[in-house]
Structures are given as C-alpha cells and as structure tokens.
C-alpha cells in the first residue's frame, strides 16, 4: 500500500514542484518543453517523473489513512490515529498545559495579521473556541512551518470515518446552525470508503473576489471526534456576518465545547487575523512554500471526511451572491476553461508556473457550478436529502441541475485514472436525457483540466484545454491527431484525451511484444512492432479511407503511392506549426536547427572537398559587423583558423556562410578519425542504399520496440502536415564499420553538398516494421549527453537489407572494439 502511495506522489506531484526544487542530477526530458515526448512515453508505458528531493515530498504529502481512497489523499509513511481516543485518560494531566498554549495562541493570533506573522509556529496559532476545554495534540509528520498548512489540515480520520457528506454546493449554502451535531456512525468498511464522496472547500480567509469577510458571529456545535479547531476557524471564516449571503461550509467544533459569547468574540478576532495571514501567504508571489501549503490545504480539505451537520434551507428572500468567475455552463462559450491560451495572460503567475493546478482548483471551487468526474469510472454518489436539494436550487444555475440528483464532486487520483477501475461498484451510467457539464482532470504529465460536454448521442471530446504547458501549436497538432486517428477503423484514443464511453479492448496487433532487435544478436531476429496503420498513420484521412482498407502486405505501396503522400515529403516547412522534435536533421537556410542535429557529425563539400564539422555552436550569436558569422544553437561549424584574441574563423555548414565568431560560442566535437587511430585496419566494405528520410524525434530510452514504434507513429503523424508542400529528403545511406552516413542526393544546392554521420559506437538500436518492411529506424545516443534520438526512413522496397547491414557492421565493430579495448593477454598477465 505504501508503494502505491509513493508511486502516486512521484508521478503526480513531480509536475507540481517548481524547477528550482529539483536536484541538479534530475535530467528529465520535461526540460525539452515538448508534449510529443510525453505522448511517446505514455504510449510505451514509461514515465518521465524522477524522484524529487525530500523536502518536496514532505511538503506535498497529504492524506493520513490506511485505506487509499479514490481521491487525492496519499502519504509517505502511514500512521495510526487510534491513539487520539485511546489515550483519553491522559487528558486531565495535560489540561493545564493545553490551556497555556491556547492562551499563547490567542495572543499571537490577535497580532498575526501582518506579514510578519508568517514566521510564527503553526501549533501556537491554532485557535480554540474555549479556554476551559482541552484539545490533544494530533500526531503528524508534516512539520510545515508556514501558517497555511496547519490551519486547515485534518488528518484525524484514521478511526472515525463519518457518513458520506453531500456535495460541496450544498454545504456552502448551509448556515451556522446552533444545533449540536449528531453522533457519528460506525467506521465505514474499506469498500464503502472507496465510494466515499468528498466535498471541496473554498480557500480560507477570503472570498473568491479576494475580499476579506467581516468577523463572523460566534457559533459552536456538539462534540465531534474528527473535528479540529483549525478547520473550524477556516470554515467559519467563510460565513459573512453583515450580508448573510454566504453560509459556512461546515459546522465543526472541538470536543466538549459549549456556546460562549466571550469565547466566540475572541475566536472571531483570531479568525480575522489568521485569515489575513493566509491571504498574505497565498498572494505572495515569491513564497513557494506558502503556495505549497495552500495547495496542500485545498486538497487535504477536499479529501478529509468530516461530520455533517443538519441542513438548514437558505431563506428565499436573500439575493444570490454574484460569482467572481464565469460559471461553467453547457452553452457558456466564454468559460475560462475553454479559453485556452486566451486566458493565459490573465493568470496571476507565469504561464509555466507549476501552481496553475492550485489556481484552477480554487476557481473551480469558488464557482460552484461544475463537478470533477472521472468518465467511465465514476463512483457511486451519496444519498441526497430533499432539504439539501431545495437549498441547492437557490444558487446552482438551472442548466446545470439534474432533475434526479444534483451535481457532486469527486476527486479521483491519477492511479484511478490510469489504472484499472477500483473494486467498488460503479454508479449507473447516465442516460442521454441527463446531460451535464463535467470537468475532467486529464493527462497528468501536463496538468491539463479539460471540459467534456457530454451531449446526447455523441462521445464527449475535449475542447481547448486550459493548460500552461500546452501551446497553440501543440494543441493544433493534438486536435489534428485526434481527428485523424478517430477516422481510422482500428484507431486508439490518443494519450492526451479520454472518452466517457467504455474504450474498446486493444486487438492482438496493438500489444507490444517483448522481442527486441538489438544490434548484437542474430541478424535474422526481427522487431515486433504494432500495426502500420497506427504506427504510420499516413492514410487515416477521411477522404482516403480506401487506402486504409488495403491489406497489410500492400500497405506500404498503397500509402506511399496515394495522392496525399507523394514520393516527396519533408517535415521542416517553416510555414506550418509543429513540434521542433520533428524537424529534419538536414536543415536549410529557411528553418532553424533541430535539437536532434547534435546527435551526429555534419559534413559538406567545401571548395570541392568533403569536410566534416569540427565544432558545434552552443549559443546563439547575432553578428553586429559584416565579417561576423551568425550562429544558432547546434549549428555545425567548420573552424578554419583560430585567432589570438579568442575568435574563430569558420564556416557555418547550415547557412553556408563564412565569418568570425567568439571561440566560447562553439565547442569541439569528437571526430571519428580520433576514434579509429587505434584500429588495426580500415573499413573493408561499405553498403549504400537509396532511401527517403522521414525525420528524427528525441526518445527517452536507448532501445525498445515500443520506443521505436512510438517514434515512427509521431514522425508519420507529423509528416501529414507537410507532405503536400515539400519533397522528401531522398538520401543515400552509407553503412560501414565507422558508422552510418546520410548523404542527401537531391532537393537543392544545399542538400547536394551536405551529409550527416552517426558513429557506430553511438548507435544502440535498430529495426524495421515486421508487417511492412518499408519502414526502418535506428536509435542513436548523443556523443556527450544522456540523450537519445530515433531516425526513421522509408523506401519503396523492403528495408530488411538495411537492417541486416547495420547489424553486421555493428557486430564486426563490436568484436574489433573488444579485441582492441579488452585484449585477452591482459587477463593472463594479471
């Protein structure tokens, strides 16, 4: 159970941690700022989340329960909370000590309204309704020093699980009733806890408009084992004393508390100061710990079961409170959840801020109009009361109401979204006559919250996603991929979207086989990949369905011979927007260099002689004089002369220009000639093949049939955007013991004199498609960094001879390298 919680904490909240908190050795591929790589890892079942530092784990640990709920509650070390009630006989011994601490907390809470109160300890600032009562310190391992973490954490739910509370729309409308709370029922079973519906509470201390409410009237209820004075302070701070338009979301009090006017007035002053402190913490842009605590509070309040008071209907004469944000309705086109990039400038933080999820949760909670629901895996709703439904009808819009049961909130963790359904029985599926807006927490790698409008007779599809990690270009590519793959007969839903209906099981051809074609095994071993229709995706357009229905044996010729895929295709068109990972490694003067160009050595013909690059640009250099050379990152540079003033005179192989540039703007690359100095003989054979280059994409692993398949799929999908504009990069593959050389043979004067070389020692994996051998790819490692790229080729004929040639070259190179690097004589000498 602890392993599951640990895995969820690493996979979900790694994206919520700020980049500055990650260790320097964390070189996750999220730094490349590309969603396509995350889709590749989602397809292959890999994860890009790495282990975060211990401070980050402690600050993000939330729940304290033995049984994992289908909500956002998890922890690193589970604790037992029966000790709270087992040690009740020790209350009399610590009563005097508790009263002194509460008096200190009362004095500090009055003076804690300024920003200077952030440094105060959280334990001393917890208010209590009465000075005569004693509240035992709860066991916790959070040790958060900020104020916002201790005010609203309720982790005393180990042995006292309350009845399933109603939805948060109802509890917001409740008034602070003076009635004592009912006695709690017996603890729920683990199966019932799986169906336990939780409520989401708004941000403590201020309303959704940022205004601080006036001091609330003092009120207290009966005893509740799971109550906490800190939560009571936060919950009571939501009630408005002057307008009475807002009701407290929950009525909680400490054990043995009575209604006292003096204690209530003192509590109101403490709540006011604590609210100001929390508002200062949550609005501070430079305090990352405050944001972490606030996010922890929001999710912890939503995940902590609490006692449920008697509902009291809201008077009808009170005007409804105007929300600060637009509600999410079925016909509301101006909703912020659909605005996408238009709403990004309105965010209070940076577009790449990892705390965007906290902002969205706060907005969603404050609006009170759209529930979070997991499509296809919804949990059973809690029973509804007629009084609660009547009180809910006063504030919920009419288009969002359900005639049978009103909206409810369900927070589902990422393990529930990605894994199999929980053993708890699922709720009955809503029919076509019960449409309603649902917010779907989708794609955990991007922190995207996408609205799904479940319309009758149509499977809900995500619209514009309000995510800071997705740009307009990537959203267009994602929508294009979804449209193309849904038109195919055996298509699979892309990783970035999920449907509300039940997903059809994958057929046998889409299951990844464990057989791998590594370069050191027998040359007859083949690579088992998925079907070409999903992998290539070149014929998935609706107007070309006839080419999709071709047989698997004729799929390669049909796809390459169709009108939509001429024999010339290239991914590097500057007019269209797509990911930089799909840019051709052979770039011309109209497009920028791709990040995969540094994986090999560039060479071109200079003054009638083929020269290889000697340096690689590591910074961008903009010339300010006529004799200076423009450089971009990863540009291949041939240094012809080194000046004394730390300036180089060289030739930019990408642009074909000469000039001078600072010496520190380029780094030397290891050439293949240096590696072959110890070789006893020169390469005796060279195989040449005429193929077409499709593109390169960066991958997270150096081998794997799933990695190669996903790379082919992404490259082929990106090719559909540019197949009508540019001819393909027709190239000659020269395979030898030195490596693989890609020489361009057509397309322009730049292409005729340029080539790319990958050293054999950096090639780690290769293979062709078993059902359509016209597709071939190999994975190379960066010469200096721990980065990998996959290069995909296509041909009119079978590419199996290319795979056998690469395997043969690698086998001979490996044997020769072992004989040179590890001679057997040294073993006997020692």
From Swiss-Prot:
Highly expressed in brain. Expressed in all neurons. Also expressed in testis, primarily in the epididymal epidermis. Coiled coil: none annotated. GO terms for biological process: behavioral fear response; dendrite morphogenesis; JNK cascade; MAPK cascade; mating behavior; modulation of excitatory postsynaptic potential; negative regulation of apoptotic signaling pathway; nonassociative learning. The modification Phosphoserine is found at residues 257, 304, 307. Residues 111-278 are annotated as: JNK-binding domain (JBD). The JNK-interacting protein (JIP) group of scaffold proteins selectively mediates JNK signaling by aggregating specific components of the MAPK cascade to form a functional JNK signaling module. JIP2 inhibits IL1 beta-induced apoptosis in insulin-secreting cells. This is C-Jun-amino-terminal kinase-interacting protein 2. It comes from Mus musculus (Mouse).
